[in-house]
């Protein structure tokens, strides 16, 4: 069973020769774009022996300048796959897949509606202030903010479809908005969920799988309960949310679950090889081999040795 077939079997809840693994990290800035990023992805895939080739996305919605009030959301224009930042991402995907030279399960990162909406202003103001600003503006002038979200969602939907057409097997959809401290359940249902669903649907309609990554901490996981019909694989911060693998399996009975290890601490980062192997085998023993992909809560530290990741991948082999 090659890596791609192993991942496809896991997604289909079929028997696997061993549990596949998927890990990723943000590459250093100097190798995060262009040809350097192509090489970095291929090196990571080969040196970690992961079953999934996750393609990172640092080609973000462009900066728009100052955001002084809700009306400034009108400054966000419409984008599509021909916009320069998307062209760069799609070209990188194609070059990575050409460079691997073997059957590969490639997963293209698509930032969700919430993340994509903060990217045009995050660098100027900082992550938490921008999250708070966006929530405040939504309450002050919902119409203007939601109009901007519509434009962004249309762009990300086009990107999701284009990623599949470029050769990706699926998308890794990085979702924000489930945190209890930023939105109420009602705000999430109106301002986040419809756009998440639109983008996930676009990937599905293009023939790709959807990996839903529910990011950050203090999550109200029930907000995502209705996403199950649009997700092939679900991943979240088991230790960060907090929400156990078993709870996730009950919430998404038809999806494959991905995770099992903490990403910034614990045995993967700090443990011995023996401790890491024991932890991986315990996760698989407790959860089972069917409908499971070994992974972490989120991206790993940029500086983690690739040998540590390979040790986790190989620990899943019978």
Predicted feature descriptions by range:
Residues 58-76:
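A short glycine/small-residue-enriched secondary-structure motif
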Residues 1-31, 35, 40, 51, ...:
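Active-site loop segments of alpha/beta catalytic cores
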Residues 46-64:
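Short N-terminal amphipathic alpha-helices
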């Amino acid at each position: 069973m090659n890596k791609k077939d192993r991942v496809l079997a896991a997604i289909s809840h079929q028997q696997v020769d061993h549990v596949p693994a998927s890990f990723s990290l943000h590459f250093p800035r100097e190798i995060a774009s262009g040809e350097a990023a192509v090489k970095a992805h291929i090196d990571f895939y080969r040196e970690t022996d992961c079953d999934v080739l996750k393609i990172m996305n640092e080609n973000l919605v462009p900066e728009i300048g100052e955001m002084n009030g809700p009306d400034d959301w009108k400054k966000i224009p419409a984008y599509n796959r021909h916009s320069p930042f998307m062209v760069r991402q799609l070209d990188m995907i194609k070059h990575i897949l050409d460079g691997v030279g073997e059957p590969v399960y490639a997963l293209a990162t698509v930032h969700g509606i919430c993340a994509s909406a903060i990217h045009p202003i995050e660098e100027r103001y900082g992550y938490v202030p921008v999250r708070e600003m966006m929530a405040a503006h939504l309450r002050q002038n919902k119409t203007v903010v939601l109009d901007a979200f519509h434009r962004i969602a249309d762009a990300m939907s086009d990107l999701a479809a284009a990623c599949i057409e470029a050769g990706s097997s699926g998308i890794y959809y990085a979702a924000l908005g489930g945190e209890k401290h930023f939105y109420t359940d009602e705000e999430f249902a109106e301002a986040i969920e419809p756009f998440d669903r639109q983008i996930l649907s676009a990937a599905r309609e293009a023939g790709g799988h959807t990996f839903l990554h529910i990011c950050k901490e203090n999550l109200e996981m029930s907000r995502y309960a209705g996403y199950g019909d649009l997700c092939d694989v679900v991943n979240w911060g088991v230790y960060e949310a907090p929400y156990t693998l078993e709870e996730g399996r009950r919430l998404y009975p038809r999806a494959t679950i991905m995770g099992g290890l903490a990403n910034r601490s614990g045995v993967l980062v700090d443990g011995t090889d023996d401790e890491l192997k024991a932890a991986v085998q315990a996760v698989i023993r407790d959860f089972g081999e069917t409908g499971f992909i070994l992974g972490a809560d989120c991206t790993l530290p940029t500086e983690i040795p690739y040998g540590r990741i390979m040790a986790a991948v190989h620990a899943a082999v019978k």
